[in-house]
Amino acid sequence: FLVSTILVLFLFSVVFRYFPRNFNYFFQFSDWINFNYKEDAVLVSVFAFPNILMVFGLSLLTSFVAFYHSILDPIESAQLKLGSNVLQAEDALLFVAQKSILAFVMFYGRYLVYHIFTSLFKIEQLAKPHFFKSVQANIQFFSILYFGLFLIYFIAGSAYQPSLEQISILVDAYFLVRVVYFYFLFKNSFNLNNISLAAYLLFLEGQVVFFGIRQL
């Protein structure tokens, strides 16, 4: 936990130091109560270097949460230990590296998916906003979740560990709140057909709500 926390803090510190506008955008929690999408200079390109750094930081966060999830799951924990009673450091590093790379590819892969399906639903202008708002919401939620788990570990040690069910409920609730938030945000910010918007979000965000933490 300590090593992973230092790594995440270092990465976000670099963005905060050299790209403060990007950092402020992705950690602007007040957006959850502001249902208006505004273009910003940091949103010009999803492949701008600071945005890539933030997506990579998000990939690390989700891989750490996935690692914690796997430790709590008896079947996945047994696979991680590979027959040994103690989890080896190299196995943990390999797991996190694989999950981080996979998550990074999937996050940018969803940008392509957004382009395809916004075109199918005739709401092409939504592809980039959907990507940025998804990344922003995910960074905020998984930062809170991860550092919450870190504080619990730091204060209580191994004496108390949140159950797999508790973490799953939190993640599933987040994804459900997110789809409702996206609907009202995009409805208020763009001139869209409400039926097309609802169908689009139900299709793309619905699968996220359905699978929840299992996607990690």
What do these predicted ranges mean?
Residues 2-120:
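Core alpha-helical transmembrane segments of integral membrane proteins
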Residues 71-216:
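Generic detector of multi-pass transmembrane helix bundles and their immediately adjacent loops
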